[in-house]
Design a protein with these regions (language model features):
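An internal, D/E-rich "acidic patch" concept
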Residues: 62-120
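Hydrophobic alpha-helical transmembrane segments of membrane transport/permease proteins
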Residues: 16-69, 165-186
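Alpha-helical transmembrane segments of integral membrane proteins
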Residues: 2-3, 101-134, 150, 177-329
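Membrane-embedded alpha-helical segments of multi-pass transporters/permeases
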Residues: 16, 20, 24-32, 37, ...
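Residue-level recognition of pore/gate-forming positions within transmembrane alpha-helices
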Residues: 12, 20, 116, 143, ...
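Charged, compositionally biased N-terminal leader segments and the immediate start
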Residues: 1-29, 242
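Short hydrophobic, aromatic-rich alpha-helical segments embedded in or entering the lipid bilayer
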Residues: 48-80, 275-286
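Membrane-water interface segments at the C-terminal ends of transmembrane alpha-helices
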Residues: 22-29, 76, 141-172, 200-206
């Protein structure tokens, strides 16, 4: 097991290096740069800048340098712990991300726990009661969950809450707690607002994971070892939970790698629609304004989450299924 983990850890630096190059290329791919977008905004408002000012700002931000040189300087700062300064916000990137990281973690972990706590029991219940009323009900629910965009669900619930109850369900705090210092009352207010975004963001993942769990468990229930275990006199519920469920979890565990970045992004569109103070809307603003240092840092952070998530899923898979450890060794 230790050798298996060490092999995965040795790959991390190379993967992060490759992902950093990809992230930088992605933020450099659109035509123009931050100053181009800023000048366009000034022109739309009837203002303008002198050519000398533009050249001075381009030199100040390093936008006049070759792309490879910009990349090495960017990575050099990151390796020393300096994430740089946002061109749009004119503030250190570490401060901007730090301000939103706590709420992003709360929303992301809440969504993750909600998704797994609901999806796995639904999948087990549907598979063990195949073609029952509950199986059909959850199948329809899963289809709706997969087919309905999460931002559409958010818009519908926001409309219902405002039209019939006269309340706004946007944001994570009431108006009086938005800028207030942390206190017990502010935590309670956060929890009162947090559950709805968690449910909205978790519906899609719950539906997908429940379908995967049901399909995998049905395959396991048909295998010969189940008949042998029944012949030994094991109770059906204990039999299902001890062997097939554990094996059916393997594909779900393997999804952690790509699911983790999605959780921490908080679904950019949903977070923007609901005005959630998470990292997702900040990434959207950085991409629109072509704030390459802020956008690149956030994208690299998501890629690191994908790498870490894949490592976690590999370790969990090796723990759940000893055959994986034996094959690697």
């Amino acid at each position: 097991m230790l050798i298996y983990i060490m092999k995965r850890l040795l790959l991390l630096p190379f993967l992060l290096l490759i992902f950093s190059v990809i992230a930088f290329i992605l933020i450099q791919a659109p035509p123009g740069d931050f100053l181009t977008s800023y000048i366009a905004e000034l022109a739309a408002s009837g203002s303008s800048m002198e050519r000398a000012q533009i050249d001075a700002l381009r030199a100040l931000y390093g936008l006049d340098q070759p792309m490879y040189l910009q990349y090495f300087k960017w990575m050099g700062r990151i390796l020393t712990g300096d994430l740089g300064v946002s061109l749009d916000w004119q503030r250190p990137i570490s401060e901007l991300i730090g301000e939103r990281m706590g709420l992003t973690l709360a929303l992301g972990m809440g969504t993750f726990v909600f998704t797994w706590l609901i999806a796995i029991p639904i999948g087990i219940f549907s598979a063990t009661r195949k073609y029952s009323f509950f199986d059909y009900f959850f199948t329809v629910f899963n289809y709706f969950g997969v087919a309905t965009p999460t931002f559409m669900t958010a818009l519908v619930l926001m409309w219902i809450a405002f039209k019939y109850y006269g309340v706004s369900i946007t944001g994570l705090f009431s108006a009086e707690y938005i800028d207030a210092p942390w206190s017990w009352d502010r935590v309670v207010d956060l929890l009162q607002h947090l559950w709805l975004p968690v449910v909205i963001l978790g519906l899609d993942g719950t539906a997908r994971l429940a379908r995967v769990m049901r399909a995998n468990l049905l395959d396991e229930l048909k295998k010969p070892y189940m008949e042998m275990a029944r012949a030994k006199g094991l109770s059906e519920w204990r039999l299902v939970m001890k062997y097939p469920v554990r094996l059916a979890l393997n594909p779900l565990v393997s999804t952690i790698g790509w699911y983790l970045p999605l959780i921490f992004s908080g679904s950019v569109i949903v977070a923007t629609v609901m005005n959630l103070p998470t990292i997702g809307p900040m990434l959207l603003r950085a991409l629109i304004s072509q704030d390459m240092f802020l956008a690149g840092t956030i994208i690299l952070f998501y890629m690191m989450l994908a790498v870490v998530g894949t490592l976690i899923s590999d370790i969990l898979l090796a723990w759940l299924d000893p055959r994986i450890r034996l094959d690697e060794e």
